[in-house]
Amino acid sequence: MTNVPVADGVGATEAGVLAANTAAGTGASPLIGDDDRRTGRRRALAVLSLAFVVYLLMSIGLWWHVWSTHPTTVTTCGCGDPAFFLWFLAWPAHALSHGQNLFYSTLLFHPNGVNMLSNTSELLLGVPLAPVTLLFGPIATLNTASTLAPALSALAMFWLLRRWVRWTPAAFIGGLVYGFSPFMVTAVATDHLMLAFLALPPLIVGCVDELIVRQRRRPIAVGAALGVLVTAQYLVSTEVLAIMVLIGLVALLLLVGYAFLSDRQDLIRRLPHATRGLGAGAVVALVLLAYPLWFTFAGPAHLSGLVWPTLTPGTGGLTPSAIWHVHYSTADTRAFHVLGGYLGSPLPTSEYLGLGLLVVLGLGLLVWRRDRRLWLFGALGAITVVLSLGVDRTYWVPWRVLAHVPLIQNILPSRFMLVTTLCVAVMLAIIVDRARQSAGDVVRGAAGRWSARLGPALAGALGSLVGLGVAAVATVPLATGLIGKVPLTVQTVRLPLWFADAAPRLPPGQVVLTYPFIPSGIQAPMAWPAVDSLHFAIVGGGGPGGVV
């Protein structure tokens, strides 16, 4: 398999690949000893660990009012969606400790029960955090998950970008934009963990990159890892997985189309490796998901049709001007004030990217137009922005068609922005890396004429300054949108007096009808049994209301 030069946009030169493999502790070469590879792996692990510590400290800062007070009793609020997710994070610990089916419970929507896989139950987050729930309660679990989500998402993007850029700070900046974007902060502030935990998409992209572009590892092993990651994403958020699959198919079409037009022989050489790997991934995913898929579509209390029948399919799209001009989600915040007493300030809408970032991406694409990675992720980012518009437009948009496609019609258009954010993070990291390298080359060439000793050091320093300057132009507008909004506002989750004093003394198996009743949107009563270790069942519940 041939390697494409960096100037042409994908991969690296043979020397670059060897250097990257050595730095990352991967690859095999007769010129590199076992000690060198072990040293490289340790160095790569140290870099990843350091990046995670920084991201985690930033995430703790985001939730400072939680971790500096009482993380077992305070969170965003005990209202609306936070109350909803408190219950669903409490369920895995209860099911595992009582030997019950993780996928189904009659403790909610009693007596029919609730199908966890037809709901945004985030089982894969609740299961590993079950010890936290059992020891400290679901509020601590929610706070732990909400703190880890941005940090782990940023770390996963950092890992992915280290495959594509040479300068580690460029990868760190890309991870920062991905893990702490307005999309992420808004999702995590409202406890939408199925949207805030985005650590798996970069890992999935990395596997696909290995199978289709790099092709240095065994395809069956990489394909199996891809299948496991797809299964994991299904158990975190089926909506995010559906979006990833749709955009993945578009990306595959673009890659194959370009390869077919530019180098058919290379396409033919790569095809067997990619086919084996993707086939292995499909087999592993289907085997692991066979029972969950059956339970989702045919199990007890499953949903069919529109899961949000009160919403017109394709509505809930973004406002185009909010991409470059900061808007604040005052309507959502007002609903939290009315329904649950949320005290926080309005946050930037999830689609906000900032004018500086858009200018950097546009100029970077123009300057390094031979870099095919920029074209690929730029195209995917533009496509997902269009898909985020929704049907409520005076002009034609793709959702006029997608709104009539079964299953796809249940996706909220604005959530395609999660892929836009991924694409933006990748593009920014590549541009920052290329800017540093180009500036360094210019300085090195000029200084080298009169000082061979000073030239490389000066080139490295000035190149780094240029790279950091480009990053600042792109990210400062993003940060200013959050000024005065973080750390996020929190409050104590308070139970009504009866639920605090009398409910814990109820005999096991009792059913409680709460007031207010729990239609979707007034979900505060879901927090009451969650805090009480799901000691009793409740009638009704919040969440999707499709045909049962």
What are these regions (language model features)?
Residues 75-78, 187-195, 312, 338-349, ...:
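Membrane-helix boundary/interfacial segments in multi-pass membrane proteins
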Residues 261-278, 361-397, 445, 449, ...:
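Membrane-interface helix-loop-helix junctions at transmembrane boundaries of multi-pass membrane enzymes
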Residues 55, 147-164, 169-260, 277-293, ...:
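Membrane-embedded helix bundles of polyisoprenyl
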Residues 1-65, 274-282, 457-468:
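Start-transfer (signal-anchor) and selected internal transmembrane alpha helices
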